[in-house]
Regions:
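Structural motif marking the loop-to-transmembrane transition
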Residues: 1-5, 174, 178-181
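Short, Lys/Arg-enriched, disordered terminal segments
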Residues: 1-8, 79, 204-207
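Enrichment for repetitive, rod-forming helical segments
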Residues: 10-12, 74, 191-193
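A transmembrane-helix-recognition feature enriched in membrane-embedded lipid enzymes
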Residues: 177-196
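Short linear elements at protein peripheries
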Residues: 195-207
Length: 207
């Protein structure tokens, strides 16, 4: 019985820690989030965070669609000059950045205004590489609100001046939010231990 009480106490403490971190990240980011294109300040580069274009059932992923819509809206409103698409390209026939590039071009974004980061395996990699590889100390992150909050939190830790534009949310996202609780806790630990991207590499100039 004593061991059970200790186990339950540890589980309760872990749950409280995860809950606290989740809401701390939200609090830290709240003044840097925008949902109105007319109100968001201008930045040279918008960092479009990658996601799979299709769901497991073969339908277009709404997270993808709404991020694409958001990036196009910002560019056409003159709020960003370039779009840096950062995503995963680590598996055969899976290429988040190129999918976005093709669809951005189809929506009227000039190809020379789009840069691709194929080593954005996770949000931490994408944010740090935007600074260390692509030379951006100020960025506009483009994703859904919950994702933007974590990206802003990471950017702040690495002295990157970041704001974010919230893409349209997706309904029925309980599983995504549960994952976000864990992702924020992992990000918190990563920052404590100064975890760096899997790859850095040569500098790339956006111009």
């Amino acid at each position: 019985m004593k061991k059970l009480k200790i186990l339950l106490s540890l589980l309760a403490l872990a749950a409280l820690t995860v809950f606290t971190i989740y809401h701390w990240v939200s609090y830290k980011a709240k003044h840097n989030l925008y949902e109105n294109v007319t109100k968001i300040p201008k930045n040279k580069v918008g960092l479009l965070l990658g996601v799979n274009k299709f769901t497991y059932h073969g339908n277009v992923n709404l997270f993808y669609k709404y991020r694409l819509d958001a990036a196009v809206a910002l560019f056409k409103a003159g709020k960003i000059e370039y779009i840096l698409v950062s995503g995963d390209n680590s598996r055969e026939n899976y290429d988040e950045p190129t999918n976005f590039k093709n669809d951005l071009i189809a929506r009227g974004i000039p190809s020379d205004k789009i840069f691709l980061d194929f080593a954005g395996f996770r949000t931490l990699d994408s944010v740090i590489r935007a600074k260390e590889v692509f030379g951006q100390n100020e960025i506009t992150v483009i994703s859904q609100k919950f994702h933007n909050q974590r990206a802003i939190y990471i950017a702040d830790h690495f002295n990157i001046k970041a704001i974010a534009f919230n893409a349209k949310p997706v309904k029925d996202r309980n599983v995504v939010i549960l994952r976000e609780y864990l992702a924020r806790s992992k990000a918190f630990i990563d920052l404590i231990f100064n975890v760096q991207p899997k790859f850095l590499g040569e500098k790339i100039t956006i111009q």
